[in-house]
Amino acid sequence: MSTANGDLISSLYPPPPVYVKFFTTENLNKLQEWQRQQNDEEIETKQEEADDKDEKDNEKQNETQDTVPPGELRFLVPPQPPSGTHYRGYGNIWSFEDKLPSLKSANWEQLYKDDDESITSETKIKELHKLMDSLLLNFLELIGLASIDPSQYESKIKDISLILININHLLNTYRPHQSRESLIMLLRKQIDAKRASINQVEKVCSEVKQKLLKLTNIQDVYKKDSIVLPDNSDNSPMAENAESIKDEIIKKLLSEH
């Protein structure tokens, strides 16, 4: 039975809890009514507070007990955040502070001098090169030791694992920088895409303007010759000629596409 409960706690997507069935409309209405009564009682108790410290402590204890709804209603109230610096969820222990733990806090030897918060990017690069050189050297020593006395391999394996842990920890310190750079790259791609769409719209607008100018060139021709272009309602030969020219221009533009 305990094994089944352990698998249930550490499963990735556990089944819904039993108290889900208590979330009904009737219970929600009861909870609202109970909360109204609690607010009225809190206002009355604040007006009748005593100066004695012991009485205040007793009142606080009573208040904490009274703030829990009775019966099934207590399952409808969100729980208070857990106290301390860590909490348990999905079978694992998590920290409230989203911070990379140091090697010392994990009981591992730190092979570089500076702290994670004060170390600079240039120092990280230098330390990574040193750790890589040490890793290659220890690997060669392990090969030589295996050819002479294979039973003494354990110490070298521990040294190599310690170097790899330090390398992995230094690389993990780059995670915030990697997140910022990834966000910058994403924003740049979005900006480039929007600029490309804007340029495409401007290009289409310029093409439309040029085609409209071609259509209005006939107006400029008549203006240069000091000839007033008659209205479309006029049935004179000049108006008919102008209309025919416009029709030819429109047909030419349509034939291009």
From Swiss-Prot:
Belongs to the Mediator complex subunit 7 family. It comes from Scheffersomyces stipitis (strain ATCC 58785 / CBS 6054 / NBRC 10063 / NRRL Y-11545) (Yeast). It is found in: Nucleus. Keywords: Activator, Nucleus, Transcription, Transcription regulation. Residues 33-74 are annotated as: Disordered. This is Mediator of RNA polymerase II transcription subunit 7. Component of the Mediator complex, a coactivator involved in the regulated transcription of nearly all RNA polymerase II-dependent genes. Mediator functions as a bridge to convey information from gene-specific regulatory proteins to the basal RNA polymerase II transcription machinery. Mediator is recruited to promoters by direct interactions with regulatory proteins and serves as a scaffold for the assembly of a functional preinitiation complex with RNA polymerase II and the general transcription factors. The keyword Nucleus applies. InterPro entries: Med7/Med21-like (IPR037212), Mediatior_Med7 (IPR009244), Mediatior_Med7_sf (IPR044888). SUPFAM superfamilies: Mediator hinge subcomplex-like. Its main location: nucleus. GO terms for cellular component: core mediator complex; mediator complex. The keyword Kinase does not apply. One of its GO terms (biological process) is negative regulation of transcription by RNA polymerase II. Residues 44-63 have a biased composition (Basic and acidic residues). GO terms for molecular function: transcription coactivator activity.
